[in-house]
Amino acid sequence: MSPHPVSLADAMTPYLPVADGTANRPSQSGWPVFLWICLVFVALPAAAFGRAACEAGDALTLLHFNDFHGQLEPYEDPRDAVERGGIARLAATVAEVRAQDPSRPVVLLFAGDLLQGTLTSSLFLGVPDVMLLGRMGVDAAVMGNHELDYGQEVFRRLSEEAAFPFLSANVASDPEPLPVLASVVIERPGAPKVAVLGLTTPELTTATHPRNIEGISVEEPVAVARRLLPALRDKTDLVVVLSHMGIADDRRLAASVPGIDLIIGGHNHDLYAQPVLVENVPIVQAGERGGWLGRMDFQCRDGYLAQTDYALIPIDTASPEDPEIAEEVRRITLDAERELGREVGFNTRELSALRELIRREEAPFGNFVADLAREITLADVALFNGGGFRASIPAGAVTLKSIYQAFPFRNELVLGELTGARLLAALERSAALNPLDNPGGFLQVSGLRYIIEDGQLAGATIGDIPIDPTRRYRVVTSDFLAAGGDGYDMLKAMTKPVMTGRLISDMVIEGFRTESPVSAAIDRRIMRR
């Protein structure tokens, strides 16, 4: 973490390891006072403290957002076609809240998933995002499950450059610790003390490529919270859990751990107009991608901070805009467009998206993408529709432009469970499609083999064992298919679905970066008789 100003241009310079295994970043040190306070608090036993009492007149505003996913520019909300977000608008709205009453302390918290989901995030590995969040005054962020998608070393650099701490009390790394804190106590002169404990979803270890989580372990969050909360609670006015676990785990946490005043959540991309109450603990979440800003106000009553109001502030065309940040975003976007010609890998042969191939039969391109998805999610099976492959990737040097032309739809991976019966139904639908129509719904697969005979499914196996209709299989697919696209209504019955936040295009970029030269081929996983 860097408390010193660093220019965005400097921060976006190439980041290369040097001979001794360290990185070529400048040496920076110095920690805000409230972080040192935090470290002392976690070390002291709970019995040494008595609960702090706020003073009459004390007030506080908490602002929060989550699941930013690199969305620097405004976007169209698919739910209502409204233009939302844009970090220049988000920053100006935060500043507007602060200006309403300069004497009232405002704490800004980010509930995780800074990375993964836009061209600029992929190209610049999150550096513009972390720098601009610092400029808008984020006080603390929880580590999301996508913070390791570009590798541990990238996350370490981002943490060093950030003007705010990343938190996660339940994530550990061996042998080298990750640059995260368990918690912070935010203390400002004359203001209530706010303890913030960070918790990350256990899905961290399955939602990114296995190489990104080498040496990483995730402890059960309820046990961690029970262990650490008493010391934080005893000398603060408000205890906040900054969670990137999703609403189900947040509910379980609220019901299982006493002493929590508020849970600020993320991971589901849910939008709650009012807090969800569990055991009188409010749980809040503010959608995704900076489209909304949550605001909770507190006032001291009878020695305790009491919630007085909650609102979701829309970030849209009616919002103010920070002109300096808007100009910075425009420059970053232009830089990204220039970067599209950058080479990310090498292809030994063309990956063809010819309709007469990828929509009719097994294709090397389909195998490559489906295998990547199954590998990084540890799924049993991967399913992708041939219509999702929009352009071929030529042999030779592979550029970012060629990958984005092949996958322009911004589809993301969805991981869930499907019964064997429904998996077979999906394969039956694919088999029944007339190949002469070049059907976009024809399935490219990984982890299984299926045989088509006279427009019918003649067999389907996983590891030479027939698919068991009663068994549950872990399946990864696109959000398009998971929503029943191309007539695959049976995939809507997927249980425990997780929107991974990982775009197919980003996955393919990472695949070329790490596996080049790529020599995809067919292996008779799909056969027609």
Each language-model region and where it sits:
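Acidic, metal/ion-coordinating pockets
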Residues: F49-L334, I358-L372, A382, L413, ...
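Non-catalytic terminal accessory segments
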Residues: V6-S7, P14-V18, A23-N24, V33-L39, ...
